[in-house]
């Protein structure tokens, strides 16, 4: 976003307005600033600076108040050019580690992600989201098949000792346990160590000379796009802290609560909001208000960051009102992303 370069005084006043509004949820006036901040400026001078900030679109005046509140543009300027993010303090680090570190050796990846999203929600006091990694670059480890009935079987795919994907398939043929075992052995022998995307592209050629049951083999080849594709969003998504979001003053109006709950029930929509970072950029990405391009999300800020497990990339995020303690949210999100990367890499 392009800005007119603000003066030091304008930046200071804008920062104070945002920080005060975050704490109080009440519009901020010039008299409040003059009384509570030792700026060496008169009420009139502060009022003139605020008038200029309003003219530039960084703050606005609610209809029922003499004070001002930040606009999306004001928040964007603040997070891009004003705020400074400190490292996590030791007490917050301990709160993270006491929940996550014990899972390094005894917990599954799902245990780690579920614990992580709960801890993040508790510490941030916002709605928190964790998405398990996308799997195209993940290494296939092994596969098993279990007959559920004469017409259905379950395929269980293990990925890098961390993630398990299960799919139930319909059978239109008679299949014995021996036939399953033969196909499973061939698949594991020829596909183990390949990425899922490599398998999708080349499974037909890799099994072309297979002497195992052709009908079952052909079913697996035809279904490769599903079997070795990404897990569906509802299996990848972990959410915690919805209660913190709906308690915020911004969402007390019934229609806003209804819109918010409707959006949160759409897991694909939530995943789309938080997966806006670039996989090769470890920094926290912040998207504010109308930048989302979704009417239901115009009152929200979304922060997201990638975490890494080998070549796999997952996402951790925070959703909250635009009136958010951005410095705190950024530092805990950055720490959580790093913690997940190290914890899951140890498991791997």
Swiss-Prot record:
<dbReference type="InterPro" id="IPR023120">
    <property type="entry name" value="WHTH_transcript_rep_HrcA_IDD"/>
</dbReference>
<dbReference type="GO" id="GO:0003677">
    <property type="term" value="F:DNA binding"/>
</dbReference>
<dbReference type="Pfam" id="PF01628">
    <property type="entry name" value="HrcA"/>
</dbReference>
<dbReference type="InterPro" id="IPR005104">
    <property type="entry name" value="WHTH_HrcA_DNA-bd"/>
</dbReference>
<dbReference type="InterPro" id="IPR002571">
    <property type="entry name" value="HrcA"/>
</dbReference>
<protein>
    <recommendedName>
        <fullName>Heat-inducible transcription repressor HrcA</fullName>
    </recommendedName>
</protein>
<dbReference type="Pfam" id="PF03444">
    <property type="entry name" value="HrcA_DNA-bdg"/>
</dbReference>
<dbReference type="InterPro" id="IPR036388">
    <property type="entry name" value="WH-like_DNA-bd_sf"/>
</dbReference>
<keyword id="KW-0805">Transcription regulation</keyword>
<dbReference type="InterPro" id="IPR021153">
    <property type="entry name" value="HrcA_C"/>
</dbReference>
<comment type="similarity">
    <text>Belongs to the HrcA family.</text>
</comment>
<keyword id="KW-0804">Transcription</keyword>
<keyword id="KW-0346">Stress response</keyword>
<dbReference type="InterPro" id="IPR036390">
    <property type="entry name" value="WH_DNA-bd_sf"/>
</dbReference>
<dbReference type="InterPro" id="IPR029016">
    <property type="entry name" value="GAF-like_dom_sf"/>
</dbReference>
<dbReference type="GO" id="GO:0045892">
    <property type="term" value="P:negative regulation of DNA-templated transcription"/>
</dbReference>
<comment type="function">
    <text>Negative regulator of class I heat shock genes (grpE-dnaK-dnaJ and groELS operons). Prevents heat-shock induction of these operons.</text>
</comment>
<keyword id="KW-0678">Repressor</keyword>
């Amino acid at each position: 976003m392009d800005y007119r370069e603000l003066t030091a005084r304008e930046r200071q006043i804008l920062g104070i307005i945002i920080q005060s509004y975050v704490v109080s949820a009440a519009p901020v006036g010039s008299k409040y600033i003059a009384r509570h901040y030792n700026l060496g400026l008169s009420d009139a001078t502060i009022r003139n600076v605020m008038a200029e900030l309003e003219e530039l679109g960084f703050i606005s005046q609610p209809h029922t108040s003499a004070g001002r509140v930040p606009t999306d543009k004001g928040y964007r300027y603040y997070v891009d050019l004003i705020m400074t993010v400190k490292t996590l303090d030791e007490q917050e680090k301990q709160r993270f580690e006491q929940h996550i570190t014990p899972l390094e050796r005894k917990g599954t990846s799902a245990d780690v992600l579920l614990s992580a999203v709960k801890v993040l929600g508790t510490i941030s006091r916002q709605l928190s989201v964790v998405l398990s990694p996308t799997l195209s670059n993940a290494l296939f480890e092994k596969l098993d098949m279990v007959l559920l009935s004469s017409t259905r079987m379950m395929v269980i795919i293990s990925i890098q000792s961390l993630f398990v994907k299960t799919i139930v398939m319909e059978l239109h043929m008679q299949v014995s346990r021996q036939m399953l075992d033969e196909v499973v052995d061939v698949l594991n022998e020829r596909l183990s160590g390949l990425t899922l995307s490599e398998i999708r592209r080349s499974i037909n050629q890799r099994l072309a000379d297979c002497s195992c049951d052709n009908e079952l083999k052909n079913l697996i080849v035809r279904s490769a796009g599903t079997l070795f594709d990404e897990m569906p969003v509802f299996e990848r998504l972990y959410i915690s802290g919805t209660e913190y979001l709906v308690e915020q003053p911004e969402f007390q109006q019934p229609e806003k609560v209804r819109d918010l709950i409707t959006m949160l029930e759409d897991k694909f929509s939530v995943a789309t909001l938080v997966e806006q970072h670039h996989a090769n950029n470890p920094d926290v990405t912040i998207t504010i208000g109308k930048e989302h391009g979704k009417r239901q999300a115009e009152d929200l800020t979304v922060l997201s960051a990638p975490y890494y497990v080998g070549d796999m990339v997952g996402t951790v995020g925070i959703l909250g009102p635009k009136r958010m303690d951005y410095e705190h949210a950024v530092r805990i999100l950055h720490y959580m992303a790093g913690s997940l990367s190290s914890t899951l890499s140890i498991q791997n």
